[in-house]
Each structure stands twice: as C-alpha cells, then as structure tokens.
C-alpha cells in the first residue's frame, strides 16, 4: 500500500520531533491549514522555532509560510471558490 504525500509528511514530522496541529479543515473541499513547530536545545535550555503554517489541498502541500493571517485568507478564498463551483 502506497502512502500519500500527506501521510509521508506526518511521518517525517513525527520522526523529526516536529509537532503538528490542525488549525482549520474543510471536509467538503479537503483543504486544511496545519501548524508545525519544532524546538532545539542549547546550553540545557529548550528553544522553539517560529511556527510554520502549511496549506494542504487534498494530498498536495500548496503553501508554506510563517504568516497565519495570509495563509488563512488564502484558505478562506479557496474554500469559498470550491463551494461556489
């Protein structure tokens, strides 16, 4: 059984200790926004990298950026356009 791109991405994040949160998802259009966040250790202190927001349309990652407002605007537009068809 072949894994989808999304499943491979999730497995890769788990393997690299990158946390994933599903922020928004529209079941009808299969478009979702996910936030990933990673951390690292330096001098016995744990630091977190800036979160990265990823827009997935079906099984394809379409957009990846650090600005949630921009990703959310694009997500809203895509969901709206898909439902208008």
Label each residue range with its predicted role.
Residues 1-4, 8, 79-85:
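Short intrinsically disordered terminal tails
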